Design a protein with these regions (language model features):
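Non-catalytic, topology-defining segments of multipass membrane proteins
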Residues: 1-192, 196, 205, 213-233
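C-terminal transmembrane module of eukaryotic multi-pass membrane proteins
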Residues: 223, 229-292
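Acidic (Asp/Glu-rich) catalytic motifs at the cytosolic membrane interface
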Residues: 189-217, 267-268, 279-292
Length: 292
């Protein structure tokens, strides 16, 4: 699958896709309902491939790898460490897979890579003088830590009977609808907090940490200042105001925790084999890092 069929390189060697950057059809005006419906059910589209994948991972995380809700009624270091370990393994496997294939193995070299250069490994602007080490440190020590704090405290609050819990046998339709709406809520929440943290004082205080990555890699996705992580993972608080199921929290946090990896991969497409590649739709956000 040759790069030239999908884009071209400028005189500095930067890859520019032919595909135009655009908003999803559900976010355009005037409304385009037919286009929106086609996008929702197309591949790639609203549900596939990414969002149903994150829903599936979140459901497995709750129903198979998490203790029952009543176990969260008492806050303790053991519960927190279990949650932190579970989330760390998810991040290590998912982000690590992108990083290993694209940046360690360099399985497709710079084919479809926006910036022909590789991450900076000798710069004082990053912790430890390395972009990759800086990003991994912030991902786990701030990102996964704060993600796990939100998870443990919200589930503790729910276990104390402070929310209206649903019964799956009686509310399966509501349960499924809420899961399918998570991506919409995440997009809206991210848009709002992202506009907020680009307010100059907050940008200088917190968001500039993330934007040091002008040539991002997968680990850049969750490499943020702790203040930004608090804003970012606050998306899970919404479900305290609706009939509640713990899976809503886990799926939302998994979506927030994992989805930045492909969006910051630094490539337009990933080659599956010599003749097949798939679009990871990351060019718009790459331009945001490059120019803002």
């Amino acid at each position: 699958m040759k790069e030239k069929y999908f884009g071209e390189r400028d005189r500095k060697g930067h890859y520019i896709p032919k595909k135009r950057v655009s908003y999803p059809p559900i976010f355009i005006w005037p409304l385009a309902p037919i286009q929106a419906l086609k996008w929702i059910f197309s591949v790639p589209g609203y549900f596939l491939p990414w969002n149903l994948f994150y829903v599936g991972i979140g459901l497995v995380s709750w129903f198979i790898f998490s203790p029952p809700l009543e176990d969260y009624a008492e806050l303790g270091i053991t519960n927190f460490l279990l949650v932190f370990a579970k989330n760390s393994v998810l991040v290590l496997i998912y982000y690590g897979a992108f990083h290993y294939r694209l940046y360690m193995k360099r399985a497709q070299d710079i084919d479809f890579k926006f910036n022909p250069r590789w991450p900076i490994e000798n710069s004082k602007q990053f912790l430890f003088g390395s972009q990759t080490k800086d990003n991994i440190f912030l991902t786990f020590c701030s990102g996964v830590f704060i993600w796990s704090c939100f998870e443990i405290f919200i589930l503790w609050f729910a276990a104390k009977n402070n929310v209206k819990l649903i019964n799956l046998d009686e509310s399966m339709f509501y349960f499924v609808v809420m899961l399918l709406l998570i991506h919409l809520w995440r997009d809206l929440h991210f848009y709002l907090i992202h506009r907020l943290i680009h307010y100059e004082p907050l940008y200088k205080w917190a968001h500039k940490t993330h934007h040091r990555n002008i040539n991002p890699g997968p680990w850049s996705g969750l490499a943020m200042h702790p203040i930004e992580h608090i804003f970012y993972f606050s998306c899970a608080l919404l479900y305290l105001f609706f009939p509640f199921h713990p899976a809503f929290i886990i799926v939302t946090l998994v979506h927030a925790g994992l989805s930045p990896a492909p969006g910051h991969a630094g490539f337009e497409r990933i080659k599956a084999d010599g003749e097949t590649s798939f679009d990871i739709d990351s060019y718009a956000h790459y331009l945001h890092h490059k120019h803002f």
